[in-house]
């Protein structure tokens, strides 16, 4: 049997709960995107870039396309098609920080987030799953995830030579893949970090 039938995805940070189902969903032929109105441009573009990185072509629409693999994105509580298509998730999931649920089943992918940023984090999980797959075929699965901490990021606090803008951009891309959400610029030769420190 094909490897992807028993693949267990390694996503980091490790999602809170992963439940595998039977069968697979392929992103090989027609793929249709149905995105809720509450999603910002960054979240919409995240989905498109994840698909483009895996050579998956797509169309966008307001509703499902028969015979296509439909990908639904939506914000919890907004009556989205994504939420209608989601597998049952743990009670109280969306009360947690940056919570999202991702369901792959019946030739569709649904990601519902507490808000548009949480949908972005769900898409990052999808990105990791596809990166581990030799072909764009994914096991049917439900992922429930949320953050333990609201503020997650890194500090650029240096003595001497600062990072280049290219270094910063690369670290932000890497941080995005780790679902970080903050960057602090705090050079140690800033007067408020030494002589004027209070």
Predicted regions and their residues:
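Short, intrinsically disordered low-complexity segments
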Residues: 43-45, 151, 167
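Beta-sheet entry/capping signal
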Residues: 70, 108, 153, 181-184
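Aromatic-lined carbohydrate-binding surfaces of glycoside hydrolases
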Residues: 155-198
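Acidic, contiguous N-terminal accessory segments
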Residues: 1-117, 121-145
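N-terminal small/glycine-rich loop or linker at the start of catalytic domains
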Residues: 140-159
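A broad, structure-centric signal for solvent-exposed, well-ordered loop/edge residues
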Residues: 18, 80, 150, 161-163
């Amino acid at each position: 049997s094909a490897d992807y039938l028993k693949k267990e995805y390694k996503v980091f940070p490790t999602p809170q709960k992963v439940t595998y189902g039977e069968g697979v969903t392929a992103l090989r032929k027609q793929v249709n995107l149905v995105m809720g109105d509450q999603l910002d441009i960054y979240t919409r573009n995240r989905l498109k870039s994840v698909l483009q990185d895996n050579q998956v072509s797509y169309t966008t629409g307001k509703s499902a396309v028969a015979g296509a693999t439909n990908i639904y994105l939506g914000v919890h509580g907004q009556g989205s098609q994504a939420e209608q298509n989601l597998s049952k998730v743990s009670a109280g999931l969306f009360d947690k920080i940056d919570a999202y649920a991702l369901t792959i089943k019946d030739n569709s992918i649904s990601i519902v987030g507490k808000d548009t940023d949480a949908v972005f984090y769900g898409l990052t999980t999808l990105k990791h799953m596809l990166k581990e797959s030799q072909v764009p075929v994914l096991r049917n699965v439900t992922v429930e995830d949320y953050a333990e901490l609201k503020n997650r990021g890194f500090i650029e606090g240096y003595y001497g030579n600062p990072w280049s803008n290219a270094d910063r951009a690369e670290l932000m891309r890497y941080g995005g893949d780790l679902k970080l959400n903050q960057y602090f610029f705090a050079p140690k030769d800033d007067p408020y970090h030494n002589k004027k420190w209070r």
